Amino acid sequence: MKARQYINMMGMAAAVLLSSCVKDTLYDTPHPDYGKIAVTADWSARGEGIDIPATWTVTMGDYTGTETSATHTSDHLFAPGSYTLAVWNPAEEITVNGTTATIATATGNRAGTDAFVNNAPGWFFTYTEQVSIEKDKDYPLTAAMKQQVRELTLVVEPTGDAAGRITEIVAHLTGAAGTLDFATDTYGAASNVVLPFTKITEIG
């Protein structure tokens, strides 16, 4: 009779030990329900002699961050879904609202024409990408920055004695875009740009 009680007690102990085993779920990141991004800006397509901007901005969903180094990392977590990643740099005479960049207006001296925009905005670069976020993932992204402002140089060479008689040249360029939606590459209405000319005196 005592031997039978001993066997039953051992069986109860084994049952308790087996019921205490728990299976843990393993995750790949510390944020199993969200995704996280890191954005590296690639400025290699900029024009010769143009410096890398000192600061640049990253926007995605309701997140906005500013960066001064090569890669932007943030603790912000994104719920699963589709987002538009927009990257751009602050530039003189250009404002950005969402993904629409607008050049500051200027005054012109030709009546009956379209509006004038500033003729010397800062160097402006942009990048956009559709990003699909899944939970429990990190996303290293590269933004290949596109240069949106270019420099135009025109040289007027008078012939004969015209060079000595010219005191001023007044000109403007038509058809310039005053706004740009850089997510869709859609340009706004045509505007005018005043072209400033400086007299160059060659000394032979």
Predicted regions and their residues:
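C-terminal motif of bacterial Sec signal peptides marking the signal peptidase cleavage site
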Residues: L17-S20
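Hydrophobic beta-strand residues in large extracellular and virion-surface proteins
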Residues: I37-V39, V58, L85, L154, ...
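Bacterial N-terminal signal peptides that target proteins for export
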Residues: M1-M10
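Bacterial signal peptide processing site
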Residues: V22-T25
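Short helix-loop boundary/capping segments
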Residues: E151-G204
